[in-house]
Design a protein with these regions (language model features):
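Conserved strand-to-helix beginnings and helix N-cap segments that scaffold or border functional pockets
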Residues: 10-11
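C-terminal catalytic domains of large/alpha subunits in multi-subunit enzymes
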Residues: 15-244
Length: 244
């Protein structure tokens, strides 16, 4: 139910599910914005998608994994404690040659059983562990005109354990650019009648990548036990840091 607005959450949520189910990422399909197939989600905002929706995804995948093991154990005529699942087969721990493939288990769930293999979970976090970030900017200032040129911005972020380091880095770089634009170039003014004078992107100047110098991003890894695989959020913190 979480909408991917450019943050890459469809990929991140698929990675979480694939990790739990021990399957390739290509085996996971995300219906992120289809109310006919996906459950209600509070929205992709407030630094909550990976931390909250990601945890719901992890819990849901764990429940589905448990159902797979349970049905596999029934087909193998043993208890759940006696089997393991490697993403392809459910097999007996003491005799791996006795196994049932995932396709066999899926077939059995549709024929001869009243309930198919499916799971639904909800998650609300009792905590909101903050991410941390430090930033340093090198600027060049024209003392006569007041023009400020950003030469380099260095950032180090603690967002727990990044689920997808590449997407996390891009999210950080994009957020930094938004914060830099808010600080240096973006402004709204109003005429005497109260109408905004910046009514298009020709007047409202947002920075392009070529308007800033080097942007360097590093991560200080930590582990948040309440997040999916140790992840925390990384949304507002990367926008807010350049502002001071």
């Amino acid at each position: 139910g979480a909408a991917d607005m450019g943050t890459g959450c469809d990929t991140t949520l698929a990675q979480i599910a694939a990790e739990v189910l021990d399957c390739p990422l290509d085996n996971i399909t995300v219906f992120g914005a289809d109310t006919d197939t996906s459950p209600y989600d509070s929205g992709s905002y407030a630094s909550s998608t990976t931390y909250v929706t990601g945890k719901a995804t992890e819990k849901c995948a764990m429940k589905l994994r448990g159902q797979i093991c349970k049905l596999g154990a029934e087909l193998l005529e043993c208890t759940e404690d006696e089997v393991e699942f490697d993403g392809k087969d459910v097999f007996k721990s003491k005799d791996p040659t006795q196994k049932k493939s995932l396709s066999e288990i899926a077939y059995a769930s549709q024929f001869g059983h009243m309930v198919p293999l499916e799971a639904t979970e909800t998650h609300t976090s009792p905590l909101s562990p903050p991410p941390f970030m430090v930033g340093a900017a090198e600027v060049e200032v024209d003392t006569e005109t007041g023009e400020v040129k950003l030469l380099e911005f260095d950032a180090c972020v603690d967002c727990g354990t990044p689920i997808n380091p590449n997407l996390t880095r891009v999210q950080t770089e994009g957020g930094l650019l938004q914060g830099i634009g808010m600080t240096l170039t973006e402004n709204i003014t109003y005429d005497k009648n109260g109408y905004p004078e910046e009514n298009s992107l020709f007047q409202y100047k947002i920075p392009a990548r070529t308007d800033v110098g080097k942007i360097k991003v590093e991560f200080e890894s930590s582990y948040e036990p309440n997040g999916p695989f140790g992840a925390k959020s990384i949304g507002e913190v990367v926008i807010n840091t350049p502002l001071p």
